[in-house]
Structures are given as C-alpha cells and as structure tokens.
C-alpha cells in the first residue's frame, strides 16, 4: 500500500480537467475543460456523485476545441442539464477533476473573501501580523524645494510580493471596491473593524477597506497640483522578509523615498520610477475620489466633502 501511494505521488500528470472551483449555480451553464499533453480521441465523460460514487450523468462530447500549447488535446465538457444540488467530480478516461459543488449558494461570501487579500497587504498597521511596518514613510524625491523633506504617507497597501506602493494600482483597487459596494451594497458583510481586526463596527468591510485606500491616496495628493505616485523602488528587492522586519536601505534610516509626479523618468541607474505620466495619475486620483465622495455622501458627509 505504501509503495502504491509513493508511485501514485511520483506519477507525472499529463491530463487535467479544469472546473469552476467555486462551483456552479443550479440553473447556470456548466462547463468543464479537458486538456492533455498527448493527442487523445475522447468520446465521452462522466459526472460522479462524490458521496455515493455513482454515475449521475454520462454524455458524449460534442465540442472539440483547439488546444493551446503545450497541450495537444482539448475538449469542452457541457453538463448543464445536471441541476441536482450536491458535490460531484468529472471523469474522462483516467483523468478526474477535483470535487465541485452545484448549489445556488456557491458564490456566497466570495465578495468578502476577496477583502482578505487586501487586509493582508496593508502597510502601516497590518492586522495579519498584528504589528506595524513602514511607520516613518517617507522622504520626498523630485520635490523641488521640498526635496528630501519628510512627508507622512503611511498606510495604503503593499503592491505585490514586495513592499513598493503605487497610486496606479491602489487607486484602481480603491475605485473597484467602492464601485462594487455602489452596485451591490447587500453583498458585503460586517465582520471586521476599520483596523482590519475581527469585529463589527456598523460598516460593511468593503467600506473599511476602501476608506483605508482613500486615506492613503489623500496623503499622496496633499494639495492641489501636488501628487506623488510611488513609495520605494527596486532597492526593496533584497529577498524575503516580513514587512515589519524590512531592512531595505534607502539612505535615510527607516524612511523610504516618495516619488513626486513630474512627467519625467526618475531614479538612478537601475532604481527607476517608471511612471512618467501626470495626467494618468491625476485621473486615477480623480476617479477614486469622485466615487468615494458619492459613496460616503450619506455615510460620512464631512469625509465626502474632503474628497469632492
């Protein structure tokens, strides 16, 4: 048994069945896709009830798709006629899919789930770490008479797996969250505080997260015509470390550089700030602030007026 388990773990997969990992609603179109690294002449597929192991649907394949490299086989599996609530898997020859659900509640909670990533990426106080990072951001770069002076731009979100921060991505994320709330206010729950820690505060969690973004954007646009579009640069890329233990050296202790919009390429040698547009950055500020002003008009009129 142990030998068989080891051999099965070592076997190289060469065919896969891709499904909607969230699942399918009962009356929705239900499609899976078979892909293989070898040319296969697939005629049919089966849908298996995961609990009983019984076949609940067996169907001939009517649509053969053009495979995309490196695959040599691709088939579209339509099982839309299956409408019974349950957990299933699909089998095609020796290939089988992960289990998936068919139910009208498969998308419940997904809007809130996406906010988990945003809370994880927070700069300043990070609720995942229950600690703070980059609390001395930052010092002005390309600021004319203000060059090298301190400016408070704490907050916002780290952009990716590194700790750089950009208006371009942050303003877009803020706008999208505000837009989602505008269109579907009842889709979001209240399970987290403004700090990102668990708790209820009477506000949808998406509003707390978008407010985190708006507060930071206001710091990055502190006065008319004064816009900053980036914190830190490629000197950040010194390997993995937690944000509250960041040792990247920008020459001013724990402060990081804050790049002012000038319309020109900025930075030295490979430490380039590649954002050269002013109008593009201004537009992103404007869209986030305009949507925020509309959303907060009835929630926090004073904050709405600040954004307008």
How would you label these PLM feature ranges?
Residues 4-14:
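Bacterial Sec-dependent signal peptides at the C-terminal "C-region" and cleavage site
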Residues 16-104:
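Ligand-binding face of N-terminal immunoglobulin V-set domains in extracellular IgSF glycoproteins
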Residues 27, 97-132:
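Low-complexity, Pro/Ser/Thr- and charge-rich linker/hinge segments at domain boundaries
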Residues 63-81, 129-184, 264-271:
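Active-site-adjacent substrate/metal-binding segments within catalytic domains
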Residues 77-80, 158-168, 195-215, 271-280:
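Aromatic- and glycine-enriched glycan-recognition loops and surfaces
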Residues 92, 163, 174-197, 215-223, ...:
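Well-ordered alpha-helical scaffold segments within catalytic/enzyme domains
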Residues 152-160, 228-308:
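Active-site lining segments of carbohydrate-active enzymes
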Residues 205-231:
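Carboxylate/His-rich catalytic cores and anion/metal-binding grooves
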